[in-house]
Amino acid sequence: MAQRALWRPQATPGPPGAAAPPGHRGAPPDARAPDPGPEADLVARIANSVFVWRVVRGDERLKIFRCLTVLTEPLCQVALPDPDPERALFCEIFLYLTRPKALRLPSNTFFAIFFFNRERRYCATVHLRSVTHPRTPLLCTLAFGHLEAASPPEETPDPAAEQLADEPVAHELDGAYLVPTDTAPESGACCALGPGAWWHLPGGRIYCWAMDDDLGSLCPPGSRARHLGWLLSRITDPPGGGGACAPTAHIDSANALWRAPAVAEACPCVAPCMWSNMAQRTLAVRGDASLCQLLFGHPVDAVILRQATRRPRITAHLHEVVVGRDGAESVIRPTSAGWRLCVLSSYTSRLFATSCPAVARAVARASSSDYK
């Protein structure tokens, strides 16, 4: 373990009782004291789990990358939580890459400084391979190998000094990312993300029930979500939401952005409030009843979710996911017209798994050895 590699900033020296400047989260190098460092393979595992890195600066002698991702269990071992409650479930990582002549590094090997939530740093030498996004040079994936702890430099860069872009450069959810499919192999090897939405463990992809374009055109103006959970939440959640029904925070991990309205709306975690928080499967229609016609051929007073979260199964039959109930207690099957079982690409699936704490938590739990 590299005891000198991981550092935690201390308070900037100043007069007794002086407050830190607004937004201050770092400190100059001489104010830093070493903390015990994690194993190099832990940092390598974290770095290689990052979905997308966004270029902050690409100078000839210094390259700076940044990513945002859900705060995972490995990250909790190296990163302090962000004090902002809206950001506490996420981690911001800065990566500085240089090739100091004094180190005589081999080809494709760099001196790297990782900053985790701007509070802790890890210095290492690392062999690096990169793949640029097909539509923009500002996004890439990085593969880290032979990561070895290194002594920190005398001068440490300050992430707060960097100018960060606040607009997306890739619009992954604007295209036809919902691809109709039949069913999944090993359909029981999955975990539930929402009603009619599953993470397929062998393939690492999301399957979900969604409307086709013709049916989607009948949705309220401005709504871009098409998946079943979103529609059911609009039908059953009371107007205004709020409290326990308020939407959870999301980021855009594909663009390293804190604001992510498109990701939050389209995320398969969007589901009826009473299902998400109380595990109720019979839900009264308390929201926009006019939207029921997108799912049922007859009026209904309630919807019934037929799959238990403990033993989910990806199904190509919509009535195995949801049915309605009318005032006479009769069961109303959903109409199949306009609805398709869809699969998301591995890329888009990872976007949601690294942007949504609920999806990340469900996948991690299902992937663990003790999941039953």
UniProtKB/Swiss-Prot annotation:
Sequence ranges of Low complexity compositional bias: 20-30
Record's GO cellular component terms: host cell cytoplasm; host cell nucleus; viral tegument
Region: Disordered, residue numbers: 1-38
Domain of life assignment: Viruses
Protein's UniProt keywords contain Coiled coil: no
Record key words, sorted: Host cytoplasm, Host nucleus, Late protein, Virion, Virion tegument
Family, per entry: Belongs to the herpesviridae cytoplasmic envelopment protein 2 family.
Protein name: Cytoplasmic envelopment protein 2
